[in-house]
């Protein structure tokens, strides 16, 4: 994903036409539920699709995309496997909120809730990835082996595997599948 060319877009990734069209229509549909004008939303907000296809890029280059959206109101749209990562970025960055996409959830109400600025830490529904787990996920995404990670993090290989296993439980998936 090229962040410089996306910085004028309010929905990332813009090349995902189904997500772009669907979210655009959802925002228009909830116009009566939100306090801001559609033009202000288009100008001030960035909606980011955290799905399994794009997760590797967001993990490996999180400092880049976070700096690219600085000054914008960032809303993360999180699939089930990316909820813990979305919570991590919410806690550790200037993210406005997270919309959890699930079968039993009303996405319209959740989207309006976040846009209106009502999303709070108490609304976090799942565990979040810890800082150490995130470091290990990043290094794994860069292709590093557990032994190298242990040497860099000054811990045992067993500790690296434990953090990976804990992160995988929170992400409902093996890390290597997410970062392919």
UniProtKB/Swiss-Prot annotation:
Source domain of life: Bacteria
Keywords per UniProt: Activator, Cytoplasm, DNA-binding, Transcription, Transcription regulation
GO MF term set: DNA binding
Any one biological process term the GO annotation gives: regulation of DNA-templated transcription
Subcellular location: Cytoplasm
HTH luxR-type domain mapped to chain residues: 122-180
Gene Ontology cellular-component annotations: cytoplasm
DNA-binding region: 146-165
Functional note: Part of the ecpRABCDE operon, which encodes the E.coli common pilus (ECP). ECP plays a dual role in early-stage biofilm development and host cell recognition. Positively regulates the expression of the ecp operon.
Name of the protein this chain belongs to: HTH-type transcriptional regulator EcpR
Native source species: Klebsiella pneumoniae subsp. pneumoniae (strain ATCC 700721 / MGH 78578)
């Amino acid at each position: 994903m090229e962040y410089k060319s996306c910085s004028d877009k309010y929905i990332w990734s813009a090349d995902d036409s189904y997500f772009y069209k669907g979210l655009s229509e959802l925002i228009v549909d909830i116009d009566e539920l939100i306090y801001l004008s559609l033009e202000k939303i288009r100008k001030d907000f960035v909606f980011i699709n955290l799905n399994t296809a794009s997760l590797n890029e967001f993990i490996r280059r999180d400092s880049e995309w976070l700096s690219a959206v600085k000054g914008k109101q960032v809303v993360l749209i999180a699939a089930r496997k990316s909820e813990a990562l979305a919570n991590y970025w919410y806690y550790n960055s200037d993210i406005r909120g997270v919309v959890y996409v699930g079968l039993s959830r009303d996405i319209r109400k959740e989207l309006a809730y976040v846009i209106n600025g009502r999303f709070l830490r108490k609304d976090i529904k799942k565990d979040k990835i810890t800082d150490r787990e995130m470091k290990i996920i990043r290094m794994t995404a860069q292709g590093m082996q557990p032994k190298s990670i242990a040497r860099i993090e000054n811990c045992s290989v067993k500790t690296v595997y434990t953090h990976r296993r804990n992160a995988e439980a929170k992400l409902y998936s093996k890390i290597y599948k997410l970062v392919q």
